[in-house]
């Protein structure tokens, strides 16, 4: 009996990530419920944004957060070079806003947004916002981990938009 066989639970799919198991690995990662954010920045061509669920707090002092865009994204170069960006945490009723930023295109058309002191587009009315200066960027496989020093933050009461198993949902308080 192998160690893996010894710790396997009934109805559990045990696998080694990679290759033919990439879908199983994605499904396992999808079991972890995340919040949903829209990250924005400015390029010479104008504002840019993308929907992201790879957001986390790093440090309270100094205030640091991180997110990690995929290198395969056509927007990766713009975000990995941006010196400033804003991370918007979406509320449970903002799934349509999330969808606007899942593809390249005209996400800012007919959208209420402003420019902050650093020239970054900010979207009012989100559940929380973190306006950041890039503190570091780290190569991490097929993604880049971007660490931001939070210059300003905003927050309002409300329920977050959640993402799990490939679907949006709401957080249910117990």
Curated annotation (Swiss-Prot):
Disulfide bonds: none
InterPro entries assigned: Flavin_Rdtase-like_dom, NADH-dep_flavin_reductase, Split_barrel_FMN-bd
Sequence similarity: Belongs to the non-flavoprotein flavin reductase family.
Record-linked SMART domains: Flavin_Reduct
Protein name per UniProt: FMN reductase (NADH) SmoA
EC number: 1.5.1.42
Induction behaviour: Induced during growth on sulfoquinovose.
A Pfam family per the record: Flavin_Reduct
Keywords annotated in UniProt: Flavoprotein, FMN, Monooxygenase, NAD, Oxidoreductase
Any GO molecular function: riboflavin reductase (NADPH) activity
Enzymatic class: oxidoreductase
Catalytic activity reported: FMNH2 + NAD(+) = FMN + NADH + 2 H(+)
Protein's organism: Agrobacterium fabrum (strain C58 / ATCC 33970)
Statement: the UniProt record of this protein carries the keyword Flavoprotein: yes
Role: Part of the sulfoquinovose monooxygenase (sulfo-SMO) pathway, a D-sulfoquinovose degradation pathway that enables the complete utilization of all carbons within sulfoquinovose (SQ) with concomitant production of inorganic sulfite. Catalyzes the NADH-dependent reduction of FMN. FMNH(2) is then transferred to the sulfoquinovose monooxygenase SmoC.
